[in-house]
């Protein structure tokens, strides 16, 4: 969001995290008379933390009551399909309630269509009209649209993706515990783990053909974000990391 904001010539305000997650109270207090957009990723990237529905609903109500339609809240739900069913909620009902809310979803994660660059947004007509004025005219090609429609109807694949991710997450977290590494419990398809010399570990992993994401740019120089893969991919990462750390 910071880069997107800067690219538009706007001024960004980064609100410090609380326990690696969103501090909604602090985010509300950070709103100024010049504020126009507030971004919330839920589950969050790169930490994987999650804000429960009740807290999000209270934040939306508070922002709308104080600022009306002047401040738009963007709720980025890119990783929502990885949530346990008991934690999921229907954010579309909030769109009906709040004219200042945009909910964004992507098919790049759980649906496996990252190469097609396709997703969608939910909002009331006032905001969708503004978005349609500035979006590129051919931003999603016909093949991507057809694939997206098919993917949205494939509940079986989505369930398998959820189950594979859940099992892989457990494997990674157990490995981190055996290695004595601190990690952040994740609600997404990745786990944030503290390895100390993250730059050095990342380079060593790359030499073994294992790609993870350094997050020093997010203020976490000792941490790596590790995406959850297939069982054999997870084991390859664990073996490489264990060798590098000498454990």
How would you label these PLM feature ranges?
Residues 1-10, 138:
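Substrate-binding/gating loop at the entrance of the active-site cleft, primarily
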Residues 13-15, 37-44, 72-77, 184-186:
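Short beta-strands and strand-loop turn motifs
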Residues 14-19, 215-216:
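Short beta->alpha connector loops at strand-helix junctions that form conserved
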Residues 100-184:
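PLP-dependent aminotransferase class I/II
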Residues 17, 166, 174-208, 224:
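Conserved PLP-binding catalytic core of the aspartate aminotransferase-like
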Residues 6, 22-34, 46-73, 77-110, ...:
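Active-site pre-lysine segment of PLP-dependent enzymes
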Residues 54, 58, 207-208, 212-213, ...:
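PLP-dependent enzyme catalytic core of the Aspartate aminotransferase-like
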